[in-house]
Amino acid sequence: MTAREGRAPLVRRVAVYGAVGLAAIAGVAIWSGAASHRGADTARLSADAAARDGASAASPPPALPASAGLPAPLAGSSAPRLPLDAGGHLAKSRAVRDFFDYCLSARSDLSATALDALVVRGIAAQLDGTIAQPEALDVWHRYRAYLDALAKLPDAGAVDKSDLGALQLALDQRVSIAYRTLGDWSQPFFGAEQWRQRYDLARLKIAQDRTLTEAQKAERLAALAQQMPADERAARQKADRQQAAIDQIAQLQKSGATPDAMRAQLTQTLGPDAAARVAQMQQDDASWQSRYADYAAQRAQIDAAGLSPQDRDAQIASLRQRMFTKPGEAVRAASLDRGAAAAR
């Protein structure tokens, strides 16, 4: 694999860093499937959610640490914290769903039984012997029932995005299934998401209404926007600013801007602190590419040495550990190696 093949575009990594809220407000996102689980990114999102929703709650025990015993999709990561309320019960928070979604990101590598065991271990690692432990297990079984019910829908609930009637039906079905399976957990798990989906669908209906003039559409869209809660409006405005910054970073990269030039330009839109972090990410990215290129060259020499598969793999693993010493780097390199091997 070349260094270029091992490259994760900086703009994509900045998007994860700077736009935590984008995935949650990106439009009518439910139509593409039952659940989209995002591995390490989900872990970062859930850490933010846990910090937000548990700010006034009792501090939960430390999360399950990264472990070599984790499934490959979770290697090098840590489970999000399960939040507790002041009485020690499981807090009704979106952060609980984030914990389960973190575990579900490994389900392609696990049987249903193994996935259940992973969740049980993760819950026990944080809540063993507490009143919140059986509560978390109960919510997990409810969430699994929700996902199983979605999977039984025709085409797993996927619909034609151009059919507004089908979109409305799909949303209604999901709301009904969530309430039936999750009960009073449906609101913390999906309430904000469902509100955004209804709002986006209402916008689509106005935009596609051929009986309205452009002026009437603008008036109705403005009236609809006034119904948006203040925190949601602020989140959308923030997302718009973040997307503009991400687009700017992509353009600067495309034009071949130097780190200093990029930092100077981004300071005007993001402020000096954020611009400095982006510049540092760019430097880190360049360092990674250089080290990965050196590693790939040495790995190729090992591949060409005619060793037994066991000796070859052992030498490559040792090389990774020597060259990638920061947390997660060796895992990232191994993942790229597997991708290169699969592509050959």
UniProtKB/Swiss-Prot annotation:
GO MF term (any one): unfolded protein binding
Membrane topology classification: Single-pass membrane protein
Subcellular location: Cell inner membrane
Record carries keyword NADP: no
Domain of life the protein comes from: Bacteria
One Pfam family it belongs to: Lipase_chap
Entry keyword set: Cell inner membrane, Cell membrane, Chaperone, Lipid degradation, Lipid metabolism, Membrane, Transmembrane, Transmembrane helix
GO biological process: lipid catabolic process; protein folding
Transmembrane residue ranges: 14-34
InterPro entries referenced in this protein's UniProt entry, alphabetically: Lipase_chaperone
The UniProt record lists the keyword Protein transport: no
Predominant location: membrane
Any single Gene Ontology cellular-component annotation: plasma membrane
Family to which this protein belongs: Belongs to the lipase chaperone family.
Primary role: May be involved in the folding of the extracellular lipase during its passage through the periplasm.
UniProt name for this protein: Lipase chaperone
Gene (UniProt): lifO
